[in-house]
Amino acid sequence: NPEKLRPMSDKFSISPTEVHRLEGQKLSLQPDFVAVEEPLEIQLLVGDSTAAQPISVTMRTPGNDESLALGFLFTEGIIKHGNDVQSIHVAEDPSGNALTVQLKSHVTVDLAKLERHFYTTSSCGVCGKASLEAVQQQCNIELPKTQWKVPSQVLYSLPDSLRNQQANFAQTGGIHGCALFDLDGNFILSAEDVGRHNALDKLIGHCISSMPTIPLSNHILMLSGRISFELVQKAAMAGIRFIAAVGAPSSLAIDLAEDMGITLVGFLRGERCNIYTHPHRVNP
């Protein structure tokens, strides 16, 4: 049904950027591409109602948003098949990041139950700019100015150090990890979980309960996978100023790191990496 799956053609799934590429001790400015990350709000029109009810906000890469909405509604048990949907269209929102799904008259939905079940984070607006501003308002930690630099050889040592701490990953190959290091690359603590966001929450929670220094402004956070907006958000709340990861960051993760004064390093493998924001904290 073309009415149901009309493409959102003005959205792009990748975005051009420039990175400082560090190979060995050589630093160069290179063009690159990153995956776009933006919020998508899913709204429902049920029965005779003329007011759409927001039920979920999810961070996603634009593209096939209508399919994402249908899949979400089906896997959450809100619809049983495609025929339950009358239409899907882009909501009247200037960001273009909201979809309204109109259900057919025979479909009954307990909207009050949905509101309780789906937690929509207050820091997640329906445009990237709103999300960034919300995090800036939440992060009221006073951060000291940093004078330090991380030597490239310290940076290159971090992936192996993290891997050595991941006992569960070594056995299963299916778990995310993160670790905190001091500026000399000495291991402090790590956490693991099947969810990368949970792993970081565990690590920060341990710091809150056992370490005297929050914010963690003089530490390095090392991640085992990709860097999403939410991971940078959590790190920013803890005052972390340096994030390194084996994987790539999303576009919104880069934007947030830039705004919050966080050095963001991705594709850290062997003796090479990409520095996406605030490269002054890396000493080649």
Set out the residue ranges of the language-model regions.
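Feature captures the catalytic cores and cofactor-binding loops of soluble hydro-lyases/lyases
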Residues: 115, 196-284
